[in-house]
Amino acid sequence: MSKPIQMEKGVKYRDADKMALIPVKNMPSEQKEVLRKPDWMKIKLPADSQRIQDIKSAMRKNNLHSVCEEASCPNLAECFNHGTATFMILGAICTRRCPFCDVAHGRPLPVEAEEPKKLAKTIADMKLKYVVITSVDRDDLRDGGAEHFANCNREIRELNPHIKIETLVPDFRGRMDVALDLMKDNPPDVFNHNLETAPRLYRKARPGANYKWSLQLLQKFKEQHPNVPTKSGLMMGLGETKEEIVEVLKDLRAHGVTMLTLGQYLAPSRHHLPVERYVPPSEFDELKEIALELGFTHAACGPFVRSSYHADMQAQGIEIK
């Protein structure tokens, strides 16, 4: 029997190194014929600009991270050019190793106590009116990082009293009640937690996560804060059926969720889960209509939609595709 890999604290494991650490072995993209992108998935990326460099410089200066960079989001250039970014707190190393995600896995460094203040000042310097805060999973922390989320919300509002905050949280596995209690006095304006895919695909795509647990997290937060909208997102193209997605939408509505994002999964590398199919825009349109019929007040559905893509516009109900 081979010895388990001894991970060094603070070292990022990515691509093949990360996939090698996943107990549930999946067929990686490198062993399959890679699907060619259809025309609707081909876009011209905006050129590099001073605005993009300014945002990156502000991040580096304060030792902050964006999920845009860490997860290799295809919308990075567009969002940075518009002066928006999704900040990723609690470091850039995740304790989970989901094979669809490009965020590094490993043993995280200790939480930086000054991060909330640095984050608040950076947001003030950028003159943002709407901000999305997300994080890596921190299963190494007793509260899963919940108190740090609360501290960030508090510090951001102290320096930016008119800002709107959306938090995209992990599942706080095994510590949900503790986490919700720690965050109750500093809730966001929108509470987001992504289900990512249909429950049948959890073992393959979200090892370590639990579909029902995630639904309960969304429901319990809503019960605690009935006036704060809850939101969730799903990827298409991992092997799910349209019928399975509709059932997930029904589950979300049954648990009080009113905001939805649906987007096309793109494999970050040949080592990640392969794209099983490219979902045509017309199918996203159909699912949006179904979502609205089910009672979602906001539904951003389209190939390039991501959970925090134009989140400020999503919150206003402006159509996003």
Swiss-Prot record:
Enzyme superclass (EC): transferase
Residues in Radical SAM core domain copies: 80-297
Cofactor(s) needed: [4Fe-4S] cluster
Database matches in SMART domains: Elp3
Domain of life: Bacteria
Pathway(s) this gene product operates in, as recorded in its UniProt entry: Protein modification; protein lipoylation via endogenous pathway; protein N(6)-(lipoyl)lysine from octanoyl-[acyl-carrier-protein]: step 2/2
Record InterPro entries: Aldolase_TIM (IPR013785), Elp3/MiaA/NifB-like_rSAM (IPR006638), LIAS_N (IPR031691), Lipoyl_synth (IPR003698), rSAM (IPR007197)
Location of this chain's protein in the cell: Cytoplasm
Gene Ontology CC: cytoplasm
Manner of cofactor binding, per the entry note: Binds 2 [4Fe-4S] clusters per subunit. One cluster is coordinated with 3 cysteines and an exchangeable S-adenosyl-L-methionine.
Stated family: Belongs to the radical SAM superfamily. Lipoyl synthase family.
Protein name per Swiss-Prot or TrEMBL: Lipoyl synthase
Species whose genome carries this gene: Vibrio campbellii (strain ATCC BAA-1116)
Gene: lipA
